[in-house]
C-alpha cells in the first residue's frame, strides 16, 4: 500500500500522472513536464513536498547535540528563523542524509529530511540522542504538509493568497524563515529559482493548494522537479550521494566544517581519507542523451581513468543534455571526457555547475 500526502485527491482531481516514488503515491506531471519546468523558470509553479518529513527537536541541549550530529557548523545559526543545509554522516564519513536545519530557539530546532531516508534518519537521531542527549524530545511532524512555490513570481503569488504574510516574509533572505499564523514560511527551494517552501497543517493543505492554483500557480510534478534541480546543480540523495560516498567527493565540501575544533560523527574519517573523486557538471557535445549510471572515460596528464554519471538528462532551459558526474580529481572545467552510450563514446565537456540559476544559463 503506497503512502499518500494530504494533497493526493487534489493531484488526482488535476489529472496528474501518479507514480510510486519510494513508496509514496506522487504526481510525475499534470500533462506536460516541459510546460511545468518552464512555468517555474519563467513564472511560478508549486510542488507537493509533503512526503518529506519535518522533525522537531526540543530540549535544553539541542544545539550541543547537533554540533556532534551534523557536518556543517550549527553555530552559524545565531538568529531565530535562520536555516542551514548540511549532511548527517556515519562514522566512516558516508552520507546518511542531506537535510535542512532551522534554528527556532535555543531549545527548539527543526529538521527537514528526505522522504526515502526518514525512517533511517529518525532511528539514527534517536540512537545518538540516547547516547548523548537522553532528555531530547524528537517529534516527527506527520501532522504537517509542505508545499514549495518556486519561480520569479512565486513570492508575489503567495502574498496574493496570504496577503497578511507579505509584511512578515518580504524581507526574508535566502535560507531564512518566519512563522505566520499556521504557516511556516521559508525562503528555500530545490529549483534554482526564488520562492518559498511553506509548511502548514495537513488538513489545511488542500484548500491552500487550490487557492495557489486559482492565483495562477502551475502545479508541477516530480519530473520537472528533477530537471529543475539538475539544472541548478543540486544533489539528489540516493543518486549523487549516499552512505558509500562522502561530502568531499560529492560536491558538498562547502557544507563540511573541518576548520573548527568541534568534533562530529564522520569527521575523523574525512580527515584521514584522501579525496580521489569529484562531482562535476557535464555538457554533451555529440548527439545523444546523458543518463544515470553511464560510464565515463577520462584522460588526464597521460593517465586513463573512469567515472560515472550520477544524474543525467535533457535540460529544457539549455536545450541540451547535461549531467552531474563523479570522476577522478584533477580534471578541470573545460576539459573533455567521453561517455559510453551503448557501443559509442560520446564527447562531453566538463563544466562548473550550476548550469542555470534564476532563469539564466551559466555555462
Swiss-Prot record:
NCBIfam families the record matches: gcvT, PRK00389.1
Task: Please list the GO biological process terms of this entry.
Answer: glycine decarboxylation via glycine cleavage system
Oligomer status and interactors: The glycine cleavage system is composed of four proteins: P, T, L and H.
Organism listed in the record: Nitrosomonas eutropha (strain DSM 101675 / C91 / Nm57)
- The coding gene here is gcvT
Q: Which InterPro entries match?
A: GCS_T (IPR006223), GCS_T_bac (IPR022903), GCST_C (IPR013977), GCV_T_N (IPR006222), GcvT/YgfZ/DmdA (IPR028896), GcvT/YgfZ_C (IPR029043), TrmE/GcvT_dom1 (IPR027266)
**Protein name, as recorded:** Aminomethyltransferase
Q: Does the keyword Zinc-finger apply?
A: no
Name the keywords, alphabetized: Aminotransferase, Transferase
Family per record: Belongs to the GcvT family.
* Classification via PANTHER family: AMINOMETHYLTRANSFERASE, AMINOMETHYLTRANSFERASE, MITOCHONDRIAL
**Protein's UniProt keywords contain Transferase:** yes
GO MF entries: aminomethyltransferase activity; transaminase activity
Q: Extract one GO cellular component term from the record.
A: glycine cleavage complex
Record field: catalytic activity: N(6)-[(R)-S(8)-aminomethyldihydrolipoyl]-L-lysyl-[protein] + (6S)-5,6,7,8-tetrahydrofolate = N(6)-[(R)-dihydrolipoyl]-L-lysyl-[protein] + (6R)-5,10-methylene-5,6,7,8-tetrahydrofolate + NH4(+)
List the EC numbers from the record.
2.1.2.10
Reported function: The glycine cleavage system catalyzes the degradation of glycine.
